[in-house]
């Protein structure tokens, strides 16, 4: 059940003095991620993809970490659900001060959620900078290639958009 999934970290580290305290912490996490106490008694297959991500976020938050590594955390979700999850992550970050290492291929989402960006190519970090530095003035040819591949929402601009080709050989 969801209560056991979210409470696993508490159980492993014996971070409570009573079952009531354990459950109250779990209920607080559920509410923080936009779910209700009643969801605790349900099974994962009874939830949508977005709700499952919220459960995963609650599970990650239950031990009060300083950093969460989110590896392709939203890639399997519909665009509208992606936005909800990322907005939730930003809200939680503002409330708790938590940091995220957000790993993704969706550059528009990376731009939206990130303060600083690192660009990896073939397992190597090829460029780092603030979001503005990377998007406004990319230095590495691979970064330039990635950014030039982002479609523009304006059809007129998109029609004349030039892509930057990067030959990594």
Give a label for each model feature:
Residues 110-112:
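A short, surface-exposed alpha-helical micro-motif characterized by mixed small hydrophobic
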Residues 125-129:
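ABC ATPase "signature
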Residues 43-47, 51:
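Conserved ABC ATPase signature
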């Amino acid at each position: 059940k969801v209560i056991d999934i979210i409470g696993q970290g508490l159980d492993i580290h014996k971070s409570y003095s009573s079952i009531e305290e354990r459950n109250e912490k779990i209920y607080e996490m559920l509410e923080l991620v936009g779910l209700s106490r009643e969801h605790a008694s349900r099974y994962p297959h009874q939830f949508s993809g977005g709700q499952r991500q919220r459960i995963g976020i609650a599970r990650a938050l239950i031990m009060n970490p300083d950093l969460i590594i989110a590896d392709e955390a939203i890639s399997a979700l519909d665009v509208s659900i992606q936005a909800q999850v990322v907005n939730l992550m930003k809200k939680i970050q503002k409330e708790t001060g938590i940091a995220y290492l957000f790993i993704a291929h969706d550059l528009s989402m990376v731009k939206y959620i990130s303060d600083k960006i690192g660009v990896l190519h073939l397992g190597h970090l090829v460029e780092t900078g603030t979001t503005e530095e990377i998007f406004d003035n990319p230095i590495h040819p691979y970064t330039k290639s990635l950014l030039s591949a982002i479609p523009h929402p304006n059809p007129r601009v998109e029609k004349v958009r030039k892509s930057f080709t990067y030959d990594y050989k």
